[in-house]
Amino acid sequence: NFDEPFMSYAVSSGGHSVIERLFVDKPNEMTSVYYLSAGQLYMDHYCSLGNQPRMVAAPTTLDEIPFKVLSVTNMASKNDLHISSHSIEFDGPDEITVRWGATKDQEPTGGSFYTVKRDATP
């Protein structure tokens, strides 16, 4: 049930990062932080599974920012379930689709996507 806000974005760190919260205020809440380093866009994902994938933006288009995994910390084994791909698609001025791909036992295991519209309500 996504009738209530389940995804939020906020600019932080003096305008140097964007914080994304997924499943806001739920037990499975996750946080991602987007930031630039030397002109390159990175994303650190703090997963409800307890691991932390670090990703870098791959070549982008006007409509999409794909990310590829650089590393994943806090996994007991490289076979653990973790997020292994991510993209943000810009569907319009007030709508995005966020896609997540997962890997378990070093094989793709599906994923999820969410299309959300901006709510200007403070």
Which residue ranges define each predicted feature?
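Hydrophobic small-molecule pocket/channel-lining residues, especially in calycin-type beta-barrels
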Residues: 1-122
